[in-house]
Amino acid sequence: MQLPLKNLCFALLACLVLAGCKSSKTASEAGGTSPAAAESSRVVAANAAFIGKMNEQKVSAKAVTAKLKANLAGGGNSISANGTLKMKRGEAVQIAFSKFGIEVIRLEIDPDSVTIINRLEKYYVRTELRNNPLLGKLDIDFHLIESLFWGEFYMPQGLDARACAERVIASESGKAIKLFMNLGSTLSVETLANAEKALPESARLLNAAGQNAAIAFGYEERVPFAGGFFPSKMNLAAQNGKESFTINMELSKITEDAKWPSHTQLSGKYKRKKAESLLKLIP
């Protein structure tokens, strides 16, 4: 079980902790000119209306708990696992993977840190979310990460639909609309949304140079939930050099249960390891 466990750990690292980013794309390929130069007031108004329509599809729930079935593949190996996905808006994203009914790995993301807990070997790794040595100096925001898991269009805190529309570059892509938003000196996000339903179909994180920033989310299916539409099937894909890693998750028994701790309490039996030690898990 050791080799699959290493692949599981690295898939979590690559796909969820956003480690590594190597791509040859250029900024012009990813986004084009700045929104201020390219968008007219009429187009900005249309983009604001579309973003507003996407917001209307968001679920109203403040918390989500779901069972999951996952398949993780990378480094020439794959492993299937069951588990749970738990989220509280503004507080936590938790994913626990189990094998034979025993929890093996837990990933916990909160506004300040990322924690990976290895239940079998009794150790954990905790790093800061920002200024993380494993994030390739990408300025990752917790609210961006949770928007990906909730399957929602990311809106920086404090910005309404109009303000976001002034920052995006929108273009048609078949029956979808592509929205590119620069988030600062190190990061941008590209969302592909169904033009008719106004629901995100995928989202990619890019660095400021327009390069793939190690992660892409895809939303294959959604179900009515809490006044909106929540992803019931989603996939995460990551690229680290020549290796690609994927996590496909199918969710069931989705509820608004919030009766669980936002932070996992660990006993003294767990040893803390440095974040850099996870790089040794690369196949």
List PLM regions with ranges.
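C-terminal low-complexity, charged extensions that often adopt amphipathic alpha-helices
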Residues: L129-R130, L135-I169, L279-K280
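Bacterial N-terminal signal peptides that target proteins for export
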Residues: M1-C9
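Edge/loop elements at the starts and ends of beta-strands within beta-rich repeat scaffolds
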Residues: E56-V64, G75-I79, K86-K88, L107-I109, ...
